[in-house]
Regions:
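Conserved PLP-enzyme active-site core in the AAT-like
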Residues: 2-280, 284-290, 295-302, 309-313, ...
Length: 337
């Protein structure tokens, strides 16, 4: 049964499986010196910007800690929303790997703003204080909300004014692009993002992410940081070949568009159910809502999904590229019984 617990629970898109099968037919050089990786790098440069530096890694936490290590020193602090993945869901890995203090900022919707960030921009040049060095943001956010280009530009402009850099966790950036009708470049390079964690695992890939470095001053150290962070794959082609397929014929966009459409269908149906209340706008493929606890407990007997805030009876439902209309219709039918 397909669940609504997480897009990490979804399968692998057939086009990605085909790419993996093709990459498996013969031997190839290791550590990224293969034709599959060369082609994937070319695709990424075509998609984002020609002079970017792509680095394929195993997972999202690995991509985040590499990006943050690149742009900070241990005496820096990293600013993020209090719901940020690096603060809540990475077991302290960013702190361990960077040595930096992480400073969470309260937000109503998971989105940072210059107004929320500015009170944390102090202590510069004071040896007694951690020096603000980086801003971490997620697109889409952990609450399913989406930054517009203007909102991103406002944050990167503020950060660069203070000599800081901005890292975007793009685990679900495809869903943001699909929702806004924008290209990957329009939400990253054109907005002044310094380093991107380009995700695909939640949108049809089997595994792997890609750290994409846009800031010229960070590129020379990137490969060394990846190796030190235990994220250099010997059989790199099995990571990289997926991204070639992912970026071919806009598979990334088609998958995300479908996931978003299924989220809207689910949201529209839930709005007609008495007792359901949404706690965040549904802008991507994540839904946050409350309903009577008895109904939640009953649905958990059939479906697997997560509490987001158990004290408030708030749950999260997530659609995927492989969510079907009948999955939603069945869920709603059981809920209405």
């Amino acid at each position: 049964m397909r669940s609504f617990a997480s897009d990490n629970n979804s399968g692998v898109h057939p086009a990605i499986m085909e790419a993996l099968t093709r990459a498996n037919r013969d031997h190839a050089l290791g550590y990224g010196d293969d034709l599959w990786t060369e082609e994937a790098v070319r695709k990424i440069k075509e998609t984002f910007v020609a002079d970017c530096e792509p680095l394929f890694v195993f997972n999202g936490t690995g991509s985040n800690v590499i990006a943050l290590q690149l742009m900070t020193r241990p005496y820096n602090s990293i600013l993020c929303a209090e719901t940020a993945h690096i603060y809540v869901d990475e077991c302290g890995s960013p702190v361990k790997m960077t040595g930096c203090q992480i400073r969470p900022i309260a937000t109503p919707d998971g989105k940072l703003t210059p107004q929320l960030i500015t009170p944390y921009l102090h202590g510069f040049a004071d040896q007694h204080h951690s020096q603000p060095g980086a801003i971490y943001l997620s697109e889409c956010t952990e609450l399913g909300t989406i930054y517009t280009p203007d909102e991103l530009k406002a944050i990167t402009s503020l950060a660069h004014q203070y000599g800081m850099r901005v890292h975007m966790d793009g685990a679900r950036i495809a869903n943001a692009c699909a929702s806004l009708g924008l290209s990957l470049r329009a939400l990253t390079v054109d907005c002044g993002i310094d380093v991107l964690s380009f995700g695909g695992t939640k949108n049809g890939l089997m595994m792997g992410e890609c750290v994409i470095v846009f800031d010229d001053s960070l590129k020379s150290e990137a490969r060394f940081i990846r190796k030190q962070s235990a994220q250099l794959a010997s059989k790199m082609r099995y990571l990289s070949c997926q991204f070639t397929a992912y970026l071919t014929d806009e598979l990334w966009l088609k998958n995300a568009t479908h996931a978003n459409a299924m989220a809207k269908r689910l949201a529209d149906a839930l709005e007609q159910v008495p007792g359901v209340r949404f706690t965040q706008k549904v802008e991507s493929n994540q839904l946050f809502l409350t309903m009577p606890r008895a109904e939640t407990d009953r649905m958990l007997q059939t479906y697997f999904f997560y509490f987001w805030n158990e004290e408030a009876d708030e749950i999260r439902l997530v659609t995927s590229f492989d969510t079907m209309e009948e999955d939603i219709d069945t869920f709603i039918r059981i809920l209405k019984k």
